[in-house]
C-alpha cells in the first residue's frame, strides 16, 4: 500500500506529545475531512470523522490516539543545558545519546542530544547502574542560558524523539518514531477512505483522542461526546519476536497479522464483540493474532466504562521497540488491520449488534 506508507510517514514525521497534539490534529483534520460526512471534535482536542449510516441506528467508534511519548522542558542551567521530565512511559536505558527535537512557542524546531556524564568519568559502581533521568540533560549546542533563551527555549516546551521514517532491508519493515499511535490515526483515515463510496448500516466515527500516554484521558471525553454503542481502540501491541522474548509468548510476531487484545491491565474485550470479529476474520481469510497483555493498556480502558458501558476491544499491530526513539512495524500487518476493521464495519447493523450483546 504505497499510499498508506506515505500516510504513515506524514503522520509520524509530525510532532505531538500528550497535551501538545495540535500539529497532529491539524494534519488529521486535513485527511479526515474529504472522506467524512462530518467532523466531530471534543474540547480537549480529539477529532473524529463521521460516516452516516444509510440504514441503522447504532454507532461504532474506531479510536486511535494523536499523542506520542516525549518530554517537557523543566529547567535551563547557566551553561544552556536543558533538563526535562518524561511524558509517557520511558525506560532510562533507551534515552542516552538519542537525538530529540524541541519545539518552541513559535513552532521553531531545535535539534538536541540527550547526554550525561561520559563513561570515562564514571566510577565502577556508577557503570553498573542505569543513569537516572535527573542526571540527563539535552545539549542543543549553546554556551549559556541566555543563548538558549534567545533560541526560543523556555519552560514547558515540547520535546519529541527525532527519528526518520525509513524502510529496512525488507521494505515491508518500516521504522519511525511515534508509530504509537500514529498507526491508529492512519488506520482511521484509511478505513474511512475504503468506505467513502459505500453505504454502511452503522454510524461510524473514526479518528483519534488525546492524552492516551498519560492515562487514557482523552478517550473518556471522546466517548462521552460520541456515546457509541460499540468501540474498537486501535493501538500498537508488544512484539514478542525478538531475542530474549520469543520463548515467552507465541504471539505478537511481525508479518503474522493484526493483534486482537483479549485483555490488558485496563480492560477485558467484550466477548460478544470478540466472537463477531473472529467470525468476520475467518470469513474473509484475514490473519489475526489473539493476545493478552497483563501490563499496560489502551484507550479501551476508558471507553468501555463510559456512559452506560460500551462493548469494546483493542485491535492493533505488533510493534518492536515501542516507547523508545524508534520502532518497527510490518506494513502487511497494517494492511490486514485496515482490511479487518473495514470488514467489521461492513458487517455491523442493528441486527448484528443485538446478536453480539449478552
What positions do the PLM features span?
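N-terminal hydrophobic/helix-forming segments and targeting peptides
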Residues: 1-358
Amino acid at each position: 500500500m504505497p499510499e498508506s506508507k506515505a500516510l504513515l510517514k506524514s503522520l509520524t514525521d509530525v510532532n505531538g506529545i500528550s497535551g501538545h497534539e495540535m500539529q497532529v490534529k491539524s494534519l488529521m483534520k486535513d485527511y479526515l475531512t474529504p472522506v467524512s460526512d462530518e467532523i466531530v471534535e471534543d474540547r480537549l482536542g480529539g477529532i473524529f470523522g463521521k460516516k452516516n449510516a444509510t440504514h441503522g441506528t447504532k454507532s461504532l467508534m474506531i479510536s486511535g490516539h494523536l499523542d506520542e511519548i516525549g518530554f517537557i522542558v523543566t529547567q535551563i542551567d547557566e551553561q544552556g543545558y536543558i533538563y526535562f521530565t518524561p511524558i509517557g512511559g520511558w525506560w532510562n536505558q533507551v534515552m542516552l545519546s538519542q537525538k530529540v527535537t524541541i519545539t518552541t512557542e513559535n513552532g521553531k524546531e531545535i535539534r538536541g542530544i540527550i547526554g550525561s556524564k561520559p563513561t570515562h568519568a564514571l566510577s565502577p559502581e556508577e557503570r553498573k547502574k542505569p543513569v537516572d533521568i535527573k542526571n540527563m540533560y539535552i545539549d542543543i549546542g549553546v554556551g549559556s542560558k541566555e543563548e538558549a533563551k534567545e533560541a526560543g527555549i523556555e519552560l514547558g516546551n515540547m520535546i519529541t524523539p527525532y527519528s526518520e521514517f525509513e524502510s529496512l532491508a525488507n521494505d515491508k519493515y518500516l521504522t519511525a518514531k511515534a508509530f504509537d499511535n500514529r498507526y491508529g490515526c492512519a488506520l482511521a483515515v484509511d478505513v474511512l477512505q475504503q468506505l467513502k463510496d459505500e453505504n454502511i448500516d452503522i454510524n461510524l466515527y473514526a479518528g483519534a483522542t488525546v492524552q492516551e500516554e498519560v492515562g487514557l484521558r482523552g478517550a473518556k471525553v471522546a466517548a462521552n461526546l460520541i456515546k457509541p454503542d460499540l468501540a474498537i481502540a486501535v493501538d500498537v501491541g508488544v512484539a514478542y519476536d525478538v531475542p530474549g522474548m520469543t520463548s515467552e509468548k507465541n504471539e505478537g510476531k511481525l508479518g503474522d497479522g493484526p493483534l486482537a487484545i483479549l485483555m490488558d491491565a485496563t480492560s477485558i474485550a467484550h466477548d460478544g464483540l470478540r466472537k463477531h470479529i473472529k467470525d468476520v476474520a475467518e470469513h474473509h481469510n484475514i490473519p489475526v493474532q489473539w493476545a493478552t497483555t497483563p501490563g499496560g493498556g489502551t484507550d479501551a480502558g476508558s471507553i468501555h466504562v463510559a456512559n452506560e458501558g460500551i462493548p469494546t476491544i483493542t485491535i492493533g499491530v505488533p510493534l518492536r521497540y515501542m516507547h523508545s526513539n524508534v520502532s518497527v512495524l510490518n506494513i502487511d500487518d497494517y494492511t490486514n488491520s485496515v482490511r479487518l476493521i473495514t470488514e467489521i464495519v461492513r458487517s455491523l447493523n442493528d441486527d448484528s449488534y443485538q446478536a453480539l450483546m449478552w
